[in-house]
Amino acid sequence: MHISDDEFERAIEQVLDDLPERFARVLENVGIVVTDEPNERELATMSNPCGELLGLYEGIPVTKRTTGYSGVMPDVITLFKGPHERVCSTQAELRQRIRKTVLHEIGHFFGFDDEYLHSHGY
C-alpha cells in the first residue's frame, strides 16, 4: 500500500489535531519526524527484531522528569513511512495504523511501556 509523503503527514496531523487540548498542550515541545526507513541505531531499540519498526519515541517521559529537568534537547517521535506501507493493504488500514502508532508513541512520552500500551490496544 503506497501513500504520498503529504498524505502520510496529513494523517499524522489529523491524529494530533484530534487530541484533547490538555494533551496537545503538553506535547508542544515534542518534535514529530517522518522518515522512510529506520536506521541501524533505531532498529536496535526493537524488543522484537522480527517485526517492523513503525515509530520510535526518544526522550525523557514526563513521569521520569525531576525538578532539575531543563536544558535538554526536545523529545522526538519518529514515524517510519515504509514499514507502515508494508504492513497495511488498504488506505483505511494505513490511516488507522498511523493513528495507532502516533498514539502509541505519545503513550511512551507519558511514561507507559510497550506491555501496557499493547494491552490497551496501542
Language-model segments: which ranges?
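Active-site rim/adjacent substrate-binding subdomains
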Residues: M1-R97, F109, E115-H118
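Short alpha-helical catalytic segment bearing the HExxH-like zincin motif
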Residues: R97-E105
